[in-house]
């Protein structure tokens, strides 16, 4: 699977959003109720939503975040053959509430990415860009 990174707002069409979420200085990942693997909070952009609105909605639905800020990190295109576009956001969570319980079974804090990821060909690429490029550019 290919995964390419672009500056924010480069792509003309977005299908997905991904949040790289920090809480108490650690990476917050979620586990879907039907899987044993860990993933970032994100998903499809719904009709009429901007990528930022979708990122905020997915963050709340999949982590229980109550107070947070999000900022665009990059665009990405991933897939085999036909690439599908998405936007990555940095989410700084100040307060977590109860999990909505719709899709995710639990969240957990990590110092780094675990080996058992739901999307092992995409998440490390996005996290690496976030960690090595995006954070380095922040004041």
Positions of PLM-derived features:
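Classical N-terminal secretory signal peptides
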Residues: 1, 138-139
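Acidic, metal-coordinating catalytic segment for phosphate/diphosphate chemistry
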Residues: 1-18
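Short connector loops at helix/strand junctions that flank enzyme active sites
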Residues: 14-16, 22, 33-35, 40, ...
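Conserved hydrophobic "DFG−1" position in protein kinase catalytic cores
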Residues: 19-21, 29, 91, 109
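Conserved Nudix-box catalytic region and its N-terminal flanking loop in Nudix hydrolases
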Residues: 22-61
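Unchanged
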Residues: 45-69, 75-129
